[in-house]
């Protein structure tokens, strides 16, 4: 699915039982859940930092562009992350 097909007004929230945090022992961001832990790569960690249940996907993209520059791939990277995170049941999109 590309950016044009994805509703950028959806607001991502971490699902109950899932917690996003920086883990010093892993030297990176992780998602903790009752059955274990998922270590995120650097770009996934950067996106995850902006999932707060308040901002929609469009606002998250805007903040990442402000932080990293107007890189054209950011839009699609964020959409891809949201789709994978939803499929893996890490987040809800409302």
Curated annotation (Swiss-Prot):
Pfam families xrefs: PqqD (PF05402)
Coiled coil start-end: none
Annotated signal sequence range: none
InterPro entries per record: PQQD, PqqD_bac, PqqD_sf
Pathway: Cofactor biosynthesis; pyrroloquinoline quinone biosynthesis
GO biological process: pyrroloquinoline quinone biosynthetic process
Keywords from the UniProt entry: PQQ biosynthesis
Highest taxon of the lineage: Bacteria
GO molecular function ontology, one term from the record: quinone binding
Family: Belongs to the PqqD family.
NCBIfam families registered for this protein in UniProt: PQQ_PqqD (TIGR03859), PRK02079.1 (NF002535)
Function: Functions as a PqqA binding protein and presents PqqA to PqqE, in the pyrroloquinoline quinone (PQQ) biosynthetic pathway.
Subunit structure: Monomer. Interacts with PqqE.
Protein's name in the database: PqqA binding protein
Species, as recorded: Acinetobacter calcoaceticus
Lineage: Bacteria, Pseudomonadati, Pseudomonadota, Gammaproteobacteria, Moraxellales
Gene expressing this chain: pqqD
């Amino acid at each position: 699915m590309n950016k044009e097909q994805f509703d950028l007004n959806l607001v991502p929230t971490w699902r109950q039982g899932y917690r996003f945090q920086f883990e010093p022992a892993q030297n990176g961001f992780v998602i903790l859940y009752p059955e274990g832990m998922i270590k995120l790569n650097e770009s996934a960690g950067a996106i995850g930092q902006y999932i707060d249940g308040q901002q929609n996907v469009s606002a998250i993209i805007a903040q990442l562009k402000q932080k990293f520059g107007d890189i054209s791939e950011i839009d699609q990277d964020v959409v891809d992350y949201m789709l994978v995170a939803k499929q893996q049941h890490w987040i809800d999109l409302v």
